[in-house]
Amino acid sequence: MTATATTTEGQETASTSGFWGLTLGSIGVVFGDIGTSPLYAFREAAIGAAHGQPVSRMIVLGVLSLILWSLFIVVTAKYVLLLLRADNNGEGGTLSLMALGQRALGRRSMFLMALGVVGASMFIGDSMITPAISVLSAVEGLKLAAPALEHYVVPLTVFILVVLFAVQSKGTARVATAFGPVMVTWFLSLAVMGIVHISDDPSVLAAINPYYAVHFLLSHGTVGLVTLGAVFLAVTGGEALYADLGHFGRKPIQSAWLFFVLPALLINYFGQGALVLSDPAAIENSFYRMVPELLLLPLVVLATAATVIASQAVITGAYSLVSQAVQLGLLPRFEVRYTSESHAGQIYLPRVNRLLLIGVMLLVLMFRTSSNLASAYGIAVSTTMVADGIMGFVVIWKLWNLRAAVAAAIIAPFVIVDLTFFSANLLKLFEGAWVPLLFGAAMVVTIWTWRRGSAILTLKTRKIEVPLDDLVASLEKRPPHIVKGTAVFLTSDPTSVPTALLHNLKHNKVLHEHNVILTIETAQTPRVDVSERVRMEKISEKFSKVRLRFGFMESPNVPRALAVARKLGWQFDIMSTSFFVSRRSLKPSSQSGMPMWQDHLFIGLSRSANDATDYFQIPTGRVVEVGTQVTI
């Protein structure tokens, strides 16, 4: 009895410590973006609502009420309580939700594909704005802490961001352990600052009543809608709760949000409101005005650390999203480097890193202040949230087995709120919202071109390909010279003869004693169980088909996967195996079915793709590349 009790207690202790470890980790990673919103969200919303006039009591209460109920409806109800339950084998995020929706429908839906692509593309646009506005708003505290350094705000921001992107290739494993404690300190500071200032005017707590939010919107017309676009700054980052589901799990994220992060944010926002009610001039920078001059510099340092952590989380999210898009066939194979031997999810994509850095630098140098940049912020996130809501309807309807009317009744209120925020942000189109839309549109065109070009290329290739069964039958009747060893031919179509095999027969006039037609597939799930990794089919004495399946969040490692095939009876020895890979040289054609500019874009994307050898982690010394020229 004692031994059993001790064992059970030990397991519970380990389970409890694991839960709190994940909760602390989620505070350090998941909530960085939304957690740094108090730096600018209330200020921008109140100034926008005042419309050049002094900030009145009704404006402060209206803005606070809008922020509070937006956090309750969009983040708490929609993401924390609803969508966190719509996981794809434990994973979340826009592309994961898209794959889950398609699996629920039992077919590929172009509408869901379009929603997923648009949502993911806008996330990339957001990945450029978040580091720019977050770090810029933190460093702007220098204007109050050391007015003489005001002219160095932009250069210092640029320096911090360049260093941040420069160290990405080294990985973040060593410093990531500090993220949780730093962000806990940040949220505790937010709460303490808020508690201190709520006493300036406790009547600010009246804003809990949604009457003030509704009254503000009804009495301010277009200005109210514009203000709503600024209020949305308080909920940006809410989508990250769902995107990081796979890293920390549902319960740790829910617990961290409901019992720590949300209370700290609300207390701080209400503290800023009370401060402005007692001193309207404080609206100029209501966040930094909450602390005495002596604490300004330490707060600037803490805020900068928090915004760097928030930026790091967004950058890592962009790497993960692009990696998923590559696995799902939405983008060409980008070079992926692994920055940790123990954590497979810690990756670095050099090309994506460079593009993000260029985008972030352009934003900082174009807008120069967080107030200017706030106009550009929001449109990308609101688009992603609308896409998540609509895809969520499909999951609730089909996967949770609810009637369409019930599923619509559950999700419709959230989609209506998201569309309202989207409309409000659209009003800022010419003030800067066009920037993330431009980034997102460029990403959509890139994905569309890659998908369309790949489909056209596959169609053209299949027209000239020879059926595999016909070739095998022909070779059995008239076999060529047989050489020892195993040849593995990579192909996307296991029913046709790989180009590399035809070239080997035509030019070398030999056939290996064992020939494997290898197909690599991506499942609609984040990961594939090892038992489902390999499927083998023997065609003849000399030919076999092998299919390897990977999840869209897995790194395809062919040699490791083929080692699993040994257990299925395949005598696989990598030292006597040659991998034959086809490399296509593409030429544009006026008959391709795409405009010429799209032909050239597709060819450029194809040339920039990482070669199959590196992407599938095949030993370079065992690879034979066969070049072919194809006109699109």
Swiss-Prot record:
Main location: membrane
Subcellular location: Cell inner membrane
InterPro entries: K+_transporter (IPR003855), K_trans_C (IPR053952), K_trans_N (IPR053951), Kup (IPR023051)
Entry keyword set: Cell inner membrane, Cell membrane, Ion transport, Membrane, Potassium, Potassium transport, Symport, Transmembrane, Transmembrane helix, Transport
GO cellular component: plasma membrane
Membrane topology: Multi-pass membrane protein
One Pfam family it belongs to: K_trans
Record field: catalytic activity: K(+)(in) + H(+)(in) = K(+)(out) + H(+)(out)
Record's function text: Transport of potassium into the cell. Likely operates as a K(+):H(+) symporter.
The protein's name in its UniProt record: Probable potassium transport system protein Kup 3
Chain's gene name: kup3
